[in-house]
């Protein structure tokens, strides 16, 4: 156990509990409080030493967060919005990545591969940040579903695109005949592993009525699906997402009466622990970045490009659905735009950039600055926007127009 910094982690979790209590009393977003607390902790003469690594984020903290988010989704609502959220996730990530990559290359002068890697890693909104924020605010059901679903899906899309670009940056020179199958396998394989693992787990769960066993088995589903997919070069994020959706959507048929509530409660607790560590560590690491680079021209340009890319990936795509059953009211579009928070995934991918990329250090610093802006500025103002747009629970949701009839 000597390799695990138990005392520092315990200290950070104690701070997280105090921040949770204080944030609720002050009516501030919890994740904003965590980042600020982490920043202040890092300025202390003797702060807890818990390094924020790619492996810690990607292999330890992300699987339970993605799984829990998918587990809590309403399967019927998710399926109903899937045509819309799929387009926003796939096309949206591509548009945002192109905007950011082009800007960082032509304006800042980064190499194409460095700009492309940054464009992809920062294009996806982070489900951890988005879902934590929206649950706290009590946003209306449909806008929450669209934002959360799109965030979960584009998470997986961005991770797959990043893996392809990383292979190129590391020296591989795959042609289209290799890239396309690899991309499709990463997507399809991730979903396949998630479905297979979750169904196998549910078959075992159906043979017990012990809630503790049920919780343990769902824990194996979360990490097992993620690690298995990664082992076979598929998307672990999509695998954990698929497993969570399957267990959340069909688990009621297999879980015992006592197990249903306890499984969900256990996963809310796991997510609280992972969320707490992720955002405190983000704050600590932002404080440890070189001060001059935090306000550099590259960081400012990146923030502006990220916002521009997000806008171009939301408003035109939403317009394409304006005469369909998936029409998004303007208030929803504004919420999707400003609610596109960045977080742990962007940092995990930035830390995984190959050393052969000349801008690697600059990309890491710029990613930290962009994430900090996203959480502190966008996250802090989201509750006000939700209230302003009258999208909080208790207000009537805007009506969805029926498809226009032909002729």
Predicted feature residues:
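Transmembrane helical cores of multi-pass secondary ion antiporters/exchangers
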Residues: 1-407
């Amino acid at each position: 156990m000597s390799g695990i910094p138990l005392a520092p982690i315990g200290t950070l979790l104690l701070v997280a509990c105090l921040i949770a209590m204080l944030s609720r009393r002050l009516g501030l977003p919890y994740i904003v409080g965590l980042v600020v607390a982490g920043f202040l902790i890092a300025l202390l003469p003797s702060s807890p030493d818990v390094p924020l690594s790619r492996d810690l984020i990607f292999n330890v903290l992300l699987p339970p967060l993605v799984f829990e988010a998918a587990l809590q989704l309403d399967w019927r609502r998710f399926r109903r919005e899937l045509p819309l959220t799929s387009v926003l996730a796939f096309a949206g990530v591509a548009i945002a990545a192109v905007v950011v990559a082009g800007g960082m290359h032509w304006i800042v002068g980064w190499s194409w591969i460095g700009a492309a890697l940054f464009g992809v890693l920062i294009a996806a909104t982070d489900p951890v940040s988005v879902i934590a924020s929206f649950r706290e605010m009590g946003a209306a059901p449909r806008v929450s579903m669209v934002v959360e679903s799109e965030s979960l899906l584009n998470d997986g899309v961005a991770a797959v695109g990043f893996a392809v670009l990383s292979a190129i940056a590391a020296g591989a020179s795959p042609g289209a005949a290799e890239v396309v199958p690899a991309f499709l396998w990463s997507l399809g394989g991730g979903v396949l592993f998630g479905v297979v693992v979750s169904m196998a787990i549910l078959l075992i769960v159906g043979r017990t009525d012990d809630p503790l066993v049920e919780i343990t088995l769902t824990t194996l589903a979360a990490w097992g699906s993620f690690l298995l997919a990664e082992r076979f070069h598929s998307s672990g994020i999509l695998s954990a997402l698929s497993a969570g959706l399957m267990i959340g959507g069909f688990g009621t048929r297999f879980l015992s009466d006592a197990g249903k509530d306890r499984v969900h409660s256990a996963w809310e607790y796991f997510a609280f622990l992972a969320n707490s560590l992720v955002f405190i560590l983000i704050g600590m690491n932002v404080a440890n970045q070189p001060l001059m680079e935090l306000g550099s021209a590259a960081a400012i340009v990146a923030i502006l490009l990220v916002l521009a890319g997000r806008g171009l990936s939301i408003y035109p795509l939403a317009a394409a659905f304006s005469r369909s059953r998936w029409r998004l009211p303007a208030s929803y579009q504004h919420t999707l735009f400003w609610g596109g928070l960045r977080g742990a995934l962007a940092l995990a991918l930035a830390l995984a950039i190959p050393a052969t990329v000349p801008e690697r250090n600059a990309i890491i610093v710029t990613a930290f600055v962009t994430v900090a802006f996203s959480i502190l500025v966008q996250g802090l103002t989201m509750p006000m926007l939700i209230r302003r747009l009258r999208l909080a629970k208790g207000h009537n949701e805007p009506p969805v127009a029926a498809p226009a009839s032909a002729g």
